[in-house]
Amino acid sequence: MAGKGVALWRAAGLFVALVLYGLLSAPAPAEIRPAEAVIGALLVLGVGLLRPLCVATGQTLLERGSPPWEMPAVLALAVLLWCPLMRGVWLDWAPGDMVRDVVPLLYLFLPVLLVPLLRAAPDRAVGLLAGGLAVAGVGFALRWWKQAEWGFGAVGVRAMADGGVYLLNAPSVLFAAIALPAFGVGMLTRGGWLRRAAGVAAVLGGLLCLVALAGAVHRMALGLAAIAFAALGLLWLRRAPLAVLGAGGIALLLATLFPEALFGALGQVAEKTRLAGANTRWEEAEAALGQALSSPAAFLFGQGWGALLANPAVGGWRVSYTHTLVTYALAKTGVVGLCALIAYLGGLAPRVLALLRSDPVLGWAVSGPLLMALGAHTSFKYLDTGLLLTLAVLAAERGKRLPPR
């Protein structure tokens, strides 16, 4: 019972951290302000000291009964932390630049640190993590709408600016855009008036995120959301036709009320694709490969944490990031680090697939943002990516379903 209570407190702390993250912080904050300090403190309290020490010393490798993904994950974390860190120190990169690489690495490996601590209360922990991510996503969307001066009429007319801190790049925005309408429609189809009111609020929150992504013409996020809704629609057509009728009715009503915005947004996506193409991702990959091939040491171990890359995607400026996880890992950690990363994510992939089978709504809500973050987006460095991975693994391990829809 004590273990369950501690797990609940950890999950509650993570929920509060996510709420503060969405309402007061940024996906990639430039400095540590009071909000970031509080979020960091809550994360440290959630993780504790014992689990990181066990991971750092290799004690977790001796534990029996661990799921098959944990051992390769712990080994991958050791390789990706220490080899590039020593390489960065050897090449005398700036300490601040090294920290900006190491912290996102720890975010990405949050499942290693958090999942074992939350297993004592998986149901509540999954609910709190999912709720926190949804609130964070809506918070980011609201703040973006505020800086856009609530210009809903501009959607489909012109591409709206992302803003200086790229609030909509947070994977939690796409998570909320998929999860909230999906769960909300289910809540509308059955239950009392309180449940239906909550369903209306969920649908509106999700639509707020979706329309924001359409206004800023986030092509990949919109495409992944469309795939998720199509997959869920086909599933529900067989299992819950009433929910499909409800969702179809809402979609038809919105298309009837706002045809210019809907078709205009589709036109904006097509126009951006024509003008921007792949957003110089191929040129960026070529630059990362060139840096990796600059020497045998760079090929094996990369240039280390803290290295900068002359990135064609940002006009040739020397920056600490690339826009895809593969090129980032290749440039910074070399082939050795890239193999460790593949082993880690490959170990988690069956968990995500299992979640798609056991809880399709949560599975699709998690899969879309993760595909975006880990495939072709800088958001692989963000806090919510690591917590989405944590949510997926924890939910899959316990066959968790959120409240009946």
Which positions does each model-derived feature cover?
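Hydrophobic alpha-helical membrane-interfacial segments at the cytosolic entry of transmembrane helices
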Residues: A73-A76, A130-G139, V203-G206, R239-E260
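Aromatic-anchored transmembrane helix interface
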Residues: P68-C83, W93-L117, V126-L133, G137
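Hydrophobic transmembrane alpha-helices and their immediate junctions
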Residues: K332-L371, E397-R398
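A membrane-periplasm/extracellular boundary helix in multi-pass inner-membrane enzymes
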Residues: W236-T273, L289-S295
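Transmembrane signal-anchor hairpin modules in multi-pass inner-membrane enzymes, especially those
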Residues: M1-L85, A120-R124, A130, M187-G199, ...
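Alpha-helical transmembrane segments of multi-pass inner-membrane proteins
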Residues: D123-A154, Y166-L235
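Transmembrane alpha-helices of multi-pass inner-membrane enzymes
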Residues: V47, V361-A373, S379-R405
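Long extracytoplasmic/lumenal interhelical loops at the membrane interface
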Residues: L275-T333, V352
